[in-house]
Amino acid sequence: MVKVIASSVRKGNVLDVDGKLYVVLTAQNFHPGKGTPVTQVDMRRISDGVKVSERYRTTEQVERAFVEDREHTFLYEDGEGFHFMNPETYDQLVMSSEDIGDLKAYLQEGMAVMLSIHEGIAIAIDLPRHVTLEITETEPVVKGQTASSSYKPAVLSNGVRTLVPPHIQAGTRVVIATEDGSYVERAKD
């Protein structure tokens, strides 16, 4: 653990508050006309996902947990959870479905991901920005329907719904942003 002043806390930092780990969602410094400047920190408890909001004086000391980011390869999912392997040491880590959240829909076997590790336990996952998936179903194009929205609904091979341009048909491979599930481009493979 490293003690840092509250004003230096940034999004993505992991803080140790009363023995529990929290990931910082937002951190804003406020300087009111009168009074002491404060840092407003919105955090999510890693153990159970509860969101909390704390105010610290900007000079107050907070404990930042030492978190190591390491590349791992996604192996498989079973009843125990999602299994990842460090390609250098061949050590395996397991993350629960709750820890991964909505990102689990984009995990593919053999995919390289970044895991945030604290004391040997994976606490957060960062997927590649884009993944390539196949369109399983989409609505047919109605000729001359250009006055309305230029995107149509589609279902991806992982079951996620997204919007795609009218020229995309079922069976087409497309690049999808993992952050929000939006269409990026047609795959070039």
Curated annotation (Swiss-Prot):
SUPFAM superfamilies per record: Nucleic acid-binding proteins, Translation proteins SH3-like domain
GO CC terms of this entry: cytoplasm
NCBIfam families assigned to the protein according to its UniProt record, in alphabetical order: efp (TIGR00038), PRK00529.1 (NF001810)
Keywords of this entry: Cytoplasm, Elongation factor, Protein biosynthesis
Coiled coil location: none
Protein name per its UniProtKB record: Elongation factor P
Entry-linked Pfam families: EFP (PF01132), EFP_N (PF08207), Elong-fact-P_C (PF09285)
The gene coding this protein: efp
